[in-house]
UniProtKB/Swiss-Prot annotation:
Coiled coil: none
This protein's UniProt keywords: Ribonucleoprotein, Ribosomal protein, RNA-binding, rRNA-binding
Protein family according to the UniProt entry: Belongs to the universal ribosomal protein uL15 family.
GO CC entries: cytosolic large ribosomal subunit
Gene name of the encoded protein: rplO
Family annotation (NCBIfam families): rplO_bact (TIGR01071)
HAMAP family in alphabetical order: Ribosomal_uL15
Originating species: Dichelobacter nodosus (strain VCS1703A)
Gene Ontology MF terms in the entry: rRNA binding; structural constituent of ribosome
Segments for region (Disordered): 1-57
Function: Binds to the 23S rRNA.
Protein name: Large ribosomal subunit protein uL15
GO biological process, one term: translation
Signal peptide (UniProt feature, chain positions): none
Amino acid sequence: MRFNELQPAKGSRFAGKRLGRGIGSGLGKTSGKGHKGQKARSGGYHKVGFEGGQMPLQRRLPKRGFRSLKKLGTARIRLSELQKIDAEVIDLNALKAAGLASERAVAAKVYLNGTISKAVTLRGVSISAGAKAALEAAGGSVEE
């Protein structure tokens, strides 16, 4: 087989509709658009969500909630992920260096998920009550 002999698999490709090419094609004359009207014109169609002047659904329904910017800037860390870090003292910079927190994070919080057997010191990182108890049971400590 040569490059010039390559062909797509049977049925994988099909020709597009040829519009306005005679009455026998089934898509001649008006090209499947019917007679007159907005939708028959070139570029003639309503915008997405337009309901003919009726108040559209996305405007009838009430707004709800918001995206907390505090949440976007806070990295959420599992307790078990602290095992991967070699440092004795773990702060936000250590979490960023280990790839556990994004570079844009301005704060971090450790949650109880998994276990920890290594004694580490958390500095400047908030921690949930359950995770704090597990960390202190493993011999670690938390500094504010």
